[in-house]
Structure formats: C-alpha cells, structure tokens
Amino acid sequence: MSNSIAVIKIGGNVIDDNVKLTAFLQDFSKLKGPKILVHGGGKKSSQFSKEIGLTPTMHQGRRITDAATLDVVTMVYAGLINKNIVAQLQSLGCNALGMSGADGNAIQSVKRNHPEIDFGFVGDVEKVNTDFIQTQLSQGITPVFCAITHNKKGQLLNTNADTIASEVAASLSNAFEVVLHYCFEKKGVLQSVEDD
C-alpha cells in the first residue's frame, strides 16, 4: 500500500450538477494509490424535505436537524447520493464502498452542545476508527463517506462533511502522508462567507 493518501471532500456544487459529478468521479477514479471520498448532501435533502412538507431550518449555514429531518438526510445522504456515487465509481473500475460513520463504527460523534442554539440531531466528530478504515484501504477498497455519523448508543447524527473529511485525514496522518482536498464553490478558505 502507498504511503500517501488523498482525502477529498465534495460539496453541493459538484453533487447537484450531474455533468460536474460525472467529470469529477472520472478524475477521482484515475487517482493512483489509496483514496477516500467524503460527500455532503447538496440541495437534494432540502428539496426532499420540502416535497414532504418539512421546512429546512439553517443557522449560519448549518442545518438544524429534528427527528423528521434526520430521517430525510439519512435517506438522501447515506442512500440516494452515496449509492449513486458508489455505482458510478464501480462503473469506472474504482472499488468503492459507500458508508456512513455508523458502518464498521467508522466515525463516532457526540451530539452538538451549543450554548444558544439547539441543533437537534447534529454531531461533532469524537473518534475515527482508523483500524477499520485502514483495513478497507489495504483490501483495495475506496471508502466513500456520507455526512451521517453515530454516537455508539444507537443514535444517528447529521455531521458536517467538511469536518468528517478533516477528522478522517487527521486520524490517518500517523500512517500516511495525507493530502486533503476540498472541492467547493467558494474561492478558497474564507474567514467569512461575505468575503467571497
């Protein structure tokens, strides 16, 4: 196994555009060596929420996740989006395995405890199961993580995909030279979204 690894996170600008997603996955599948893909949910979860009569609620760009919203984001992120990405990667010869953080106890989180806002079922990453991930990588499998984690007490949690990517990358840094890439619509890492 190579001593370097790419961890790449894609956001809504890629996920919501089939042409961009296909082009990205073609390039991603050609990357040599071990790699991990992390994805968010784009606009699809908000779209599905509205279709079933739920109004998405955001606070500073973060989704407030009540029980009904958690059901939707789990279905969309871990189901529809994740499995479509995995199927496309398989068609390109990339042996991808789609997962949430609950699968293989890959990523554990704690429910966000904010002093002013109740984010509901939103998680902050607490632990990454590096052994499990390295086992997948050693078998030639490319993990594809969605933005759902768990608390190891039976509760799924909606978790920021950017954070998942950075925590997975950091957890692997003792075993690999990690290169972390974020593919998003902003011009770079900004101190404020108004700086764009």
Spans of features found by a protein language model:
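Nucleotide/pyrophosphate-binding catalytic subdomain
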Residues: 1-196
